[in-house]
């Protein structure tokens, strides 16, 4: 099997920007009504010094024309459902996913790559249709859904040199350089691992399995095994 992950960066922001006629400082906010904070912001807002985690009032002081829109989880869920329906033209197996870093789709593309005479042509077709729908995405290929998602997230984090894993035999070597931030583990676990000098997935794979599970939990070991 060959899975393709389509990782959509900041889906709430992409959905909001589709309805704007011009590019203005834009932020998606969440939290209690009396103290909303910035969850996502576009490039124009970031250029004004606005960052995720800031209070809305502080952000508005930096950009007086800032548009602040409340996050709509139901809209995100429906958008992923619509994208999943769209994805069935490329695969009989389509799985939507959501996460802190990105939302997106997983598609099993073994047959599709043969139909399109290779993954490059398939990529071009999917990317073009996503643009027409108003979305952008980072792509990642691997024999397992989890590994494909991690590779897509690595590209989303700026690792444009990240390789895909088209064959099971190449998977471990392809995954080894991945930053552990791509694993979507909680910030505390990531910080602890980095403090121990364990910044890459390959560093984790070299650790004794029993000791790793005892220190960080069997669910983390299961994540690695499922990749």
What are these language model-derived features?
Residues 111-113, 142-147, 180, 199, ...:
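Short acidic/polar capping segments at secondary-structure boundaries
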